[in-house]
Amino acid sequence: MRTAMRKLLLSSLITVTAISGIPAVAHTPYQQIRFADTSLEAGAVSCAQLTQLRQPDLRIERATSVAANSTWDLASLMTTRVEPGFCRVEGSIEGTIDFEVWLPLKEDWNGRMLGTGNGGFAGTILTNGLAHGVQRGFATSSTNTGHHDWEQNWAVGNTRAQENYAHRAQHLTAVNAK
């Protein structure tokens, strides 16, 4: 029964993305974001100030400075030490797409961004990809693709959840992370 449901779900997702003519995601251009006397563009904003960011459909839940050489639990399988310090940003887009962005300190940043995946039907943010990226100097993002792994029927009859999983969540996370 589970195999049949998975095949049906996969078939539905492929059909939705392949033949439905889903339009490209419309998106409002961002304005320069200012915090008191500093701006993000100047690189002078503290990690904690990122919670003040206001954009349509974007909510920053937490922005936490993480000390260098911190130990992280990687998907409950193992732990690793993340050598550089970084800013851990946790938030949501449109209320259902959870994401994290790990921002290296200015002196450690290579000037590039890395969006990580999570495999399978997703539903969780895997910190191993985030740790891997930030240790190499990338501003690194990950998303749960719009649902939680404990939700068994997240896509049944929910076209928006299927679209988020298929492509929107990755796109919106990348756009907002930048």
For the regions a language model picked out, list residue spans one by one.
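Alpha/beta-hydrolase
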Residues: 115-117
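Bacterial N-terminal signal peptides that target proteins for export
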Residues: 2-12
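Catalytic-loop region of hydrolases
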Residues: 26-112, 128
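Bacterial N-terminal signal peptides
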Residues: 11-20
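Cap/lid segment of the alpha/beta-hydrolase catalytic domain
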Residues: 110, 119-178
